[in-house]
Amino acid sequence: MNAMQRLNRIVKEKGPLIAGLDPDFDKIKQVWITQNEELVADGKLEGDPEKNRTIMGTFCQDYIEAVKESVGVIKINSAFFEAMQMEDLYWNIAMNAQMEGLYVIGDLKRADIGNTSMEYAKAYLDATSPFDAITVNPYFGTDGIKPFLDLAKKNDKGIFVLAKTSNQSSAEI
């Protein structure tokens, strides 16, 4: 079953809604501190990468648990993990979402010149990747998108090409 067939099956079963996971650590941290005082009892949080990883990982897992019965698709934004230097956690969260039966979209917004796009594509669209699909940016034209498309076809994955995004100034370009 290819990516589009999987997506169509999931939409028929659970509907067209997608849960977006954009874990803004500063917002999460405030709620977390009040609910998990034992993890921050020493008052340290800012400079403690292990506590931050625990907070981020637990929040994301709780989010997946909360949405998995209501939606069949989750779009996980990589930027929030990259900013915290937690790319490995990003992959773990994607794998966990996949194991829960969700169709996993890597919200990467990647593209570049052809050979660089191919390297991005290899990273996220490999046959063993937990991502069913990823988002790509069309700014580089077909040179930037074709490597993603070719590898997605080869490995039964998908791509979503950004068109009109939801941010306020998106109509400017």
Which residues are covered by each model-predicted region?
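Conserved N-terminal beta1-alpha1 strand-loop-helix module at the mouth
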Residues: M1-I76, F81-W91, Q98-Y103
